[in-house]
Amino acid sequence: MLFVGNSLTATNDLPATVAALARGAGRRPVEYATVAPGGVNLEDHWNLTGARDALLAGPWDVVVLQQGPSSLPESQENLRTWATTWADLARAHGIRPALLTVWPETERSYAFPAVVQSYRAASVAARATLLPAGPAWLAAWRRSPKLRLYGPDGFHPSVLGTTLAALVVYTRLTGTPPSAIPLPYRAPTARILRRAAADALR
């Protein structure tokens, strides 16, 4: 599994968290690589070539693509264009493309619906599997509004937020129900995360 993103992927090491969930569930190990420098989008990754080189070096079953919230009109267009470009390259090499929906900064929480719609539209345009981490956060807050999914800066995820994103990634890509994945939290919190992931994946 190749992850191509930025600090939203790198913070708390989302790929390693996905692999840890697989281990905890006694499932097939997840082998992964990550190209996720801070502050870059998918267009930057294309021009910098390191992520392309990693993709072509494979073999990978899946490439997980991620950029910033992409809620503004020009950012939505950029996401659609470059998600499609990356997805086409992935499919040409027998790799399944997936797109990870993220979240806005806390001070722009009003943009959450636009972020969700932006990633949904981009996944359709790119014919990529949608990994709805952002919607899972919303589903978790509906059950527990004070759940701390953001880290201290109000944008990057807390460890809990990364765990929920990883649960969405792993269960969507493997078809494993969230209820089957052990989580390193007390039962009430683990239950909220599993149900939130299930809600987002419906």
State what each model feature region is:
Residues R52-T163, L167-R172, T176-P182:
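Alpha-helical cap/lid subdomain in secreted, periplasmic
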Residues A19, R23, Y170, T174, ...:
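A short, amphipathic alpha-helical segment
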Residues M1-L2, L8-T81, R91:
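Conserved SGNH/GDSL esterase-like catalytic core that processes O-acyl groups on lipids
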Residues I181-R202:
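Long, well-structured alpha-helical subdomains associated
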